[in-house]
Amino acid sequence: MAEIYPSLVQCAIVATAFKVLLFPAYKSTDFEVHRNWLAITHSLPLWEWYYEKTSEWTLDYPPFFAYFEWIMSQVARLADPAMIWVHNLEYDSWQTVYFQRWTVIVTELVLLYALQMFVDSTPGVSKRAAHAAAVSILLSPGLLIIDHIHFQYNGVMYGILIASLVLAKKKSSLLASGLVFAALLCMKHIYLYLAPAYFVYLLRVYCLPPKLSPRSIFRIQFFNCVKLGGGIAAIFAAAFGPFALKNQIPQIFSRLFPFSRGLCHAYWAPNVWALYSFMDRLLISLAPRIGLPIKADALNSVTRGLVGDTSFAVLPDITPRMCFVLTLLFQAIPLIKLFMRPTWEGFIGGVTLCGYASFLFGWHVHEKAILLVIIPFSLIALKDRRYLGAFRPLAVAGHVSLFPLIFTPAEFPIKTVYTIFWLVLFLMAFDRLAPAPTRQRLFLFDRFSTAYITVSIPLIFYCSLMHGIIFGKSYEFLPLMFTSSYSAIGVVGSWLGFMVVYFTE
């Protein structure tokens, strides 16, 4: 088969040139967060990393990410020694900005390598579709907005995730897949949401006999279990062991899992609770007319979604336990099928649906977590047109919901034009590359997908531009609420559509 043009490397070179131009762009408080972590890991002994609180941006990622920051800090001191002083808060010299921006680009090479692994592992007939999916991830507006403007290190971590998913394709590399994912968990604990799919797939394919029966279910492949369990234990020991020696595990867990936060973030992530919050807002206006009681204390919470604020004025309050039960329930449903039919595509679908469930029903979900769904789904979105039909509204809703992260006027045309161009280019390319399904497509869902994308155009125009012209500084929460709620409709609709596709495959 002829080489596909442009290659991933060529796309990465062009993308890097564009990202370098964004070095002076807006940066969020996450920039100071990571500068402070560089300072903590470089200036303080290991035992003090998870106790240091000079800055409000304390270290709250697992140890492997702290080690990652320590490695970068060894180079940071050469770029500008002042950036790694713990007490040098809010320090952002141009050397610091350029250094931290470059670290995001350089570490994103892990993503490039993983995507090339994905393309190379795909059979010839499907390689062009796999290449298109890989390029769409490499040039993702989500990664551009979150990593290269807002500032985070998602590229390297999603690269590790994709490498783990690709390694799961072959039985010979299943062990490596599980160990790579374990290492990822020790870098960022948000990937715990995907762990149930890994557990079920590795249990079924690696630890149990290939042909399952009531008798053979208890005949585990003992040596495989020992290798997998021992390898995972060794990785967690390498990450947490030094801190366990100082009895610091409770302190680390208190940083990793702060349960005092509210149900919704200050800007509602586009999930079920965004629709629930929106419904509560509507009922506040309707309650006096239809005789519903209103909780007066909840009305005092104007912004709704502040830390610790989970009250609703009309609807019942939601507790962390409810979120946990719902998340677990909607993760378990597709995992039953994965256990019974453990194919690689089914595994990627299971990972995607675990991401959906955690995003839609989780407690205090950030809008950035939508990448947990978009990126694994991208790997199978071109399997056929039924899959693509479920992916379309997710791609639109997920990326548009990230717009409020970047609220500065200078970056408005960048995020808007880039995202729209990406959506038009890749959704059109995907439509040409996705083969016809073997089963009948969902007519109503196709209509929903088309209607949803059509309505999103004027909504983006109003929320991004017209609201400010009409109302100025008034009703500032209104476009955020519209964006979140409408995006939530797209994500929920996409989830329902993909659930149908997954179970009828």
Swiss-Prot record:
Lumenal side: 1-3, 123-128, 170-173, 246-319, 381-386, 431-450, 502-505
Location in the cell: Endoplasmic reticulum membrane
Sorted UniProt keywords: Endoplasmic reticulum, Glycosyltransferase, Membrane, Transferase, Transmembrane, Transmembrane helix
Catalytic activity: an alpha-D-Glc-(1->3)-alpha-D-Man-(1->2)-alpha-D-Man-(1->2)-alpha-D-Man-(1->3)-[alpha-D-Man-(1->2)-alpha-D-Man-(1->3)-[alpha-D-Man-(1->2)-alpha-D-Man-(1->6)]-alpha-D-Man-(1->6)]-beta-D-Man-(1->4)-beta-D-GlcNAc-(1->4)-alpha-D-GlcNAc-diphospho-di-trans,poly-cis-dolichol + a di-trans,poly-cis-dolichyl beta-D-glucosyl phosphate = an alpha-D-Glc-(1->3)-alpha-D-Glc-(1->3)-alpha-D-Man-(1->2)-alpha-D-Man-(1->2)-alpha-D-Man-(1->3)-[alpha-D-Man-(1->2)-alpha-D-Man-(1->3)-[alpha-D-Man-(1->2)-alpha-D-Man-(1->6)]-alpha-D-Man-(1->6)]-beta-D-Man-(1->4)-beta-D-GlcNAc-(1->4)-alpha-D-GlcNAc-diphospho-di-trans,poly-cis-dolichol + a di-trans,poly-cis-dolichyl phosphate + H(+)
InterPro entries registered for this protein in UniProt: Glyco_trans_ALG6/ALG8
Annotated Gene Ontology cellular component terms: endoplasmic reticulum membrane
GO biological process: dolichol-linked oligosaccharide biosynthetic process; protein N-linked glycosylation
Molecular function in Gene Ontology: dolichyl pyrophosphate Glc1Man9GlcNAc2 alpha-1,3-glucosyltransferase activity
Transmembrane segments: 4-24, 102-122, 129-149, 153-169, 174-194, 225-245, 320-340, 360-380, 387-407, 410-430, 451-471, 481-501
Protein name (Swiss-Prot/TrEMBL): Dolichyl pyrophosphate Glc1Man9GlcNAc2 alpha-1,3-glucosyltransferase
The organism of origin for this protein: Neurospora crassa (strain ATCC 24698 / 74-OR23-1A / CBS 708.71 / DSM 1257 / FGSC 987)
Lineage: Eukaryota, Fungi, Dikarya, Ascomycota, Pezizomycotina
